[in-house]
């Protein structure tokens, strides 16, 4: 059930990131995204 809560919180974060990208703060949102989803090659 905790996964459902995390998804709800993630949706809110995603919407906030989209607004930041529109504002031109794409560097900050990219850093947050990297922290949430570390790139593994």
Swiss-Prot record:
One of its GO terms (molecular function) is pheromone activity. Keywords: Competence, Pheromone, Secreted. GO terms for biological process: establishment of competence for transformation. Residues 1-24 form a propeptide. GO terms for cellular component: extracellular region. InterPro entries: Bacteriocin_signal_seq, Competence_ComC. Acts as a pheromone, induces cells to develop competence for genetic transformation. It comes from Streptococcus oralis. The gene is comC. Belongs to the ComC family. It is found in: Secreted. Its main location: secreted. This is Competence-stimulating peptide. It comes from the Bacteria. The lineage of its organism: Bacteria, Bacillati, Bacillota, Bacilli, Lactobacillales.
């Amino acid at each position: 059930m905790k996964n459902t809560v995390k998804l709800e919180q993630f949706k809110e974060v995603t919407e906030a990131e989209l607004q930041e990208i529109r504002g031109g703060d794409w560097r900050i949102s990219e850093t947050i995204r990297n922290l949430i989803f570390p790139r593994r090659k």
